[in-house]
């Protein structure tokens, strides 16, 4: 089963903030697939996708820094195993806006949501789609930057890169993960 976990913060205050690109990814993914059923737990909401292979899309409801609690609960509730591919989608300040990076595993890269998942699971062995939000300006602290909203011009680029990420996700159903990774890691939008 493919398990797309979009990281973000719940609530209307965070909808279009940089830290919510994972939630925005899930919203866009749900527009491409019909929802077979949905499930809301205390720590997450999950949507079974009507697709060629079993898949779910998930939004943790624990706030970013506690995402690992939601992922741990999800794995328990759905009986997920090592045969299932967890794909965590999140913002990355080290990647320029308009680019994404797909990886099979890796460190937290300083991202607190990913750090929480690694801590809860005890492993870095899960896939990622890192969506670039660009570096923070010198005159603002990191928390203010990632919790700040995208500008109108940034949103235009973001919607394009989210389309790219959705295309990559759709190809993951049929293509080898390494091929998808190789193809999409070299593409950018403006």
UniProtKB/Swiss-Prot annotation:
Domain of life: Bacteria
EC number: 3.1.1.29
Marked site (Discriminates between blocked and unblocked aminoacyl-tRNA) residue numbers: 9
SUPFAM superfamilies, sorted: Peptidyl-tRNA hydrolase-like
Identification of the protein by name: Peptidyl-tRNA hydrolase
Site features described as Stabilizes the basic form of H active site to accept a proton, chain residue numbers: 91
Cross-referenced HAMAP family: Pept_tRNA_hydro_bact
Name of the encoding gene: pth
